[in-house]
């Protein structure tokens, strides 16, 4: 698949440690001094936006410990956002959907082993789900990847069925 479609793990890997360090330092700061006025939060948010190039408003630095942990938050911030790819092919769409439905592969690379599921899983914020939402706005729905009753049977849609729905009137 083309590089402009794939998640940019190398960029994420380069800035991950710095982002994680900022998140943990902010937590330590709050534990010691508090941040009732949010001044330190805004400073950290600005630094993270500068490092990642992302709009930080969709991330919560306050309560990551109640969510998925600092490491996952740091990865989500570090991984570049998906891009609009107007000339995506149906074959490329099929590869994406098949990856999203397949079990997570095993990696020898610890970074990929830890975080690949975060790009593949069919949920809000996951890289490929967000890629589909961006590039197939008229036909994408998270529900495409959920079990449903079809002709009286509870099942998931197949990869081909999902691709046909997403591809819609394009083809």
Where are these regions (language model features)?
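N-terminal leader regions
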Residues: 1-42
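Aromatic- and Gly/Pro-enriched, solvent-exposed loop/edge beta-strand patches characteristic
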Residues: 80-82
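Short amphipathic N-terminal alpha-helix
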Residues: 105-115
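Short amphipathic alpha-helical segments that mediate assembly, nucleic-acid/protein binding
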Residues: 16, 20, 41-44, 90-93, ...
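Compact alpha-helical subdomains of small soluble proteins
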Residues: 28, 32-76, 114-171
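N-terminal acidic leader/helix
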Residues: 7, 96-105
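A generic structural signal for ordered alpha-helices
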Residues: 1-4, 22, 71-78, 110, ...
């Amino acid at each position: 698949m083309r590089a402009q479609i794939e998640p940019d793990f190398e960029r994420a890997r380069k800035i991950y440690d710095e982002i994680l360090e900022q998140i943990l330092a902010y937590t330590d700061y709050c534990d010691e001094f508090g941040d009732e006025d949010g001044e330190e939060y805004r400073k950290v948010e600005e630094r993270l936006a500068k490092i990642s190039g992302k709009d930080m408003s969709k991330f919560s630095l306050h309560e990551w410990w109640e969510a998925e942990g600092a490491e996952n938050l740091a990865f989500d911030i570090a991984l570049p956002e998906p891009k609009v790819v107007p000339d995506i092919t149906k074959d490329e769409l099929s590869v994406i959907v098949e990856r999203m439905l397949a079990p997570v592969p095993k990696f020898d690379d610890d970074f990929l082993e830890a975080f690949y599921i975060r790009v593949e899983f069919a949920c809000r914020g996951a890289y490929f789900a967000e890629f589909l939402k961006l590039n197939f706005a008229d036909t994408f729905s998270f529900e495409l990847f959920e079990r449903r009753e079809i002709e009286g049977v509870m099942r998931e849609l197949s990869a081909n069925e999902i691709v046909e729905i997403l591809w819609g009137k394009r083809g």
